[in-house]
Amino acid sequence: MPHIDIKCFPRELDEQQKAALAADITDVIIRHLNSKDSSISIALQQIQPESWQAIWDTEIAPQMETLIKKPGYSM
C-alpha cells in the first residue's frame, strides 16, 4: 500500500507512456506519503464515456467528502 486506481476515458498510451505515468505518480507518492517504491501499486482502467455515470454514482459522488481533489463537474 498505497494502491492508486486511475479511471479515465480511453487514451492511446503505449507501454513507454504508461511506464512514464507510473514512474511520475510513484515519485509523487514517495515524496508526499514517504512510501517505499516496492509498496506502491497503480492500476489504469480505461472507461468508455457512456459508462462513466456508473463510476460517478458508485465511486465519486458517495465519496465526495473524502476526495482530496474534487471534480469540476457534476452528473
Curated annotation (Swiss-Prot):
Official protein name in the record: Tautomerase PptA
EC number in record: 5.3.2.-
Subunit structure and binding partners: Homodimer.
Active site positions, chain numbering: P2 (proton acceptor)
Sequence similarity: Belongs to the 4-oxalocrotonate tautomerase family. PptA subfamily.
Membrane-spanning intervals of the chain: none
Gene: pptA
GO molecular function annotation: intramolecular oxidoreductase activity, interconverting keto- and enol-groups
Protein origin, superkingdom: Bacteria
Keyword Cytoplasm carried by entry: yes
Localization, UniProt: Cytoplasm
HAMAP family in the record: Tautomerase_PptA
Record key words, sorted: Cytoplasm, Isomerase
Cellular component per GO, a single term: cytoplasm
